[in-house]
């Protein structure tokens, strides 16, 4: 009998549109000969499954079940593709753990850690991972322009500490723009990072590990036509994404090994993507970890899967079956 898979999308952040696009991508990637697929919407004001008719039917939060044609149906697995809260920050993972639902992503603690960019990067720094100098602010805290320039110089990036898809991010090149950029970032959350700008080549590397198999994908080089890799560049085509990246074999292997090492340090699960900047000295600097990476047809992970000569359908099956098997043995 085919398993019922919930592709869980939505969320309560600015990234909901991207989440829904990723859900459509995942729906097209998963093997429909093996699984029954449903898109489930999880938002603050709606938990619902989208039926084939387009009707939204409510989810019973007690066990994440739903009714179809009067019949109660239960899910066997949840593929989480919510970018932002509650699917990327550990909240949904904690709920699924409580009800015993297998799911695709990192667990609650790892998801919460990686969602907090500042804390995650400084945690990894203790393991020898190179990171950019940065300043962290909570809402209500202030900092003078002079202190920012003294500690970080210019240019800098100002961004929400717990957001993605470049919402609320500003590249600041002049002192007069520092405070407006901080205010903009606080519009997306209660914590903000000011980070030293590093000039270099931006690359990203995907990875997943299942029992008996480790897959680290070819790197993608990100060349944006905009000031930086912002929302417009990511989703409106203002970027060249080159897979494999135009860097040396030695540097590629170094970054792939570092990505695999970060996966193990974190105790990650499912697909992750790690972003780096390579400065002139050639030593990669960690930018951030993505534990629910975008999965539209043109997103980095599908590109890297193709470049590796793999079938995205097989990758999805690996992740689903490994978690189903592991849950049975727990």
Curated annotation (Swiss-Prot):
Domain ATP-grasp: 121-321
Subcellular localization(s) per the UniProt record: Cytoplasm
Free-text remark on how the cofactor is bound: Binds 2 magnesium or manganese ions per subunit.
One GO BP annotation of this record: cell wall organization
PROSITE patterns assigned to the protein according to its UniProt record, in alphabetical order: ATP_GRASP, DALA_DALA_LIGASE_1, DALA_DALA_LIGASE_2
Record carries keyword Nucleus: no
GO MF annotations in UniProt: ATP binding; D-alanine-D-alanine ligase activity; metal ion binding
Known pathway: Cell wall biogenesis; peptidoglycan biosynthesis
Residues holding Mg(2+) 1: 275, 288
EC annotation from Swiss-Prot or TrEMBL: 6.3.2.4
EC top class named in words: ligase
Annotated keywords: ATP-binding, Cell shape, Cell wall biogenesis/degradation, Cytoplasm, Ligase, Magnesium, Manganese, Metal-binding, Nucleotide-binding, Peptidoglycan synthesis
One family name in Pfam for this protein: Dala_Dala_lig_N
NCBIfam families for the chain: D_ala_D_alaTIGR, PRK01966.1-3
UniProt record similarity statement: Belongs to the D-alanine--D-alanine ligase family.
Biological role stated in the UniProt entry: Cell wall formation.
Name recorded for this polypeptide: D-alanine--D-alanine ligase
Organism field: Parabacteroides distasonis (strain ATCC 8503 / DSM 20701 / CIP 104284 / JCM 5825 / NCTC 11152)
Gene: ddl
């Amino acid at each position: 009998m085919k398993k019922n898979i919930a592709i869980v999308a939505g969320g309560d952040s600015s990234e909901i549109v991207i989440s829904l696009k990723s859900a459509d991508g995942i729906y097209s990637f998963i093997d429909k000969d093996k699984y029954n697929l449903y898109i489930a919407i999880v938002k603050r004001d709606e938990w619902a499954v989208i039926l084939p008719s387009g009707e939204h039917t409510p989810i019973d939060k007690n066990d994440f079940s739903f009714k179809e044609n009067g019949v109660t149906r239960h899910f066997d697995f949840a593929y989480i593709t919510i970018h932002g809260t509650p699917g990327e920050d550990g909240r949904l993972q904690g709920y699924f753990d409580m009800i015993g639902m297998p799911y695709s992503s990192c667990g609650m603690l790892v998801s919460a850690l990686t969602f907090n960019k500042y804390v995650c990067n400084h945690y990894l720094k203790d393991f020898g991972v190179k990171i950019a100098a940065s300043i962290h602010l909570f809402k209500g805290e202030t900092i003078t322009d002079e202190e920012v320039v003294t500690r970080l110089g210019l240019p800098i990036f100002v961004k929400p500490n717990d957001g993605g898809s470049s919402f609320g991010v500003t590249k600041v090149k002049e002192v007069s723009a520092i405070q407006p950029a901080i205010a903009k970032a606080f519009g997306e959350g209660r914590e903000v990072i000011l980070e030293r700008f590093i000039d270099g080549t931006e690359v990203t590397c995907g990875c997943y590990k299942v029992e008996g198999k480790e897959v680290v994908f070819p790197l993608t080089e990100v060349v944006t036509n905009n000031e930086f890799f912002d929302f417009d560049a990511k989703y409106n085509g203002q970027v060249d994404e080159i897979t494999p990246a135009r860097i040396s074999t030695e540097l590629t292997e170094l970054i792939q090994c570092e990505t695999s090492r970060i996966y193990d340090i974190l105790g990650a699960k499912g697909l992750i993507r790690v972003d780096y900047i390579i400065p002139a000295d050639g030593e990669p600097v960690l930018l951030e970890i993505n534990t629910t990476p975008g999965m539209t047809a043109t997103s980095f992970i599908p590109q890297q899967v193709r470049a590796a000569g793999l079938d995205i359908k097989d990758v999805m099956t690996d992740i689903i079956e490994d978690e189903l098997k592991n849950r049975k043995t727990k």
